[in-house]
Structures are given as structure tokens and as C-alpha cells.
From Swiss-Prot:
Annotated family: Belongs to the neurotoxin 07 (Beta/delta-agtx) family. 03 (aga-4) subfamily. Aga sub-subfamily.
Annotated protein name in UniProt: Mu-agatoxin-Aa1f
Cellular component terms per the entry's GO annotation: extracellular region; host cell presynaptic membrane
Residue pairs linked by disulfide bridges in the UniProt entry: C2-C18, C9-C23, C17-C33, C25-C31
Organism the protein comes from: Agelenopsis aperta (North American funnel-web spider)
Protease as UniProt keyword: no
Keyword entries, A-Z: Amidation, Disulfide bond, Ion channel impairing toxin, Knottin, Neurotoxin, Presynaptic neurotoxin, Secreted, Toxin, Voltage-gated sodium channel impairing toxin
InterPro entries, alphabetized: Beta/delta-agatoxin_fam
């Protein structure tokens, strides 16, 4: 399973972002998926 835009993700142990998104932790302490365009 994957999570979409603005959904919480984890770099190390999931959940991971869907294709087209990557996990960023710049919104610390929460990591979220953002579009990789």
C-alpha cells in the first residue's frame, strides 16, 4: 500500500509514497508525501 499527496509517510519503515511522490520531512515532526515534479 502507498499514500498520496500530503499524507503522512516514513522514510525508514513505511508507509511509503505512491509513484510520483516522495517523502519529505521538512514539515517536522511529520513527514509527508509531496509531488516530485
Amino acid at each position: 500500500d502507498c499514500v498520496g499527496e500530503s499524507q503522512q509517510c516514513a522514510d525508514w519503515a513505511g508507509p511509503h509514497c505512491c509513484d510520483g511522490y516522495y517523502c519529505t520531512c521538512r514539515y517536522f515532526p511529520k513527514c509527508i508525501c509531496v509531488n516530485n515534479n
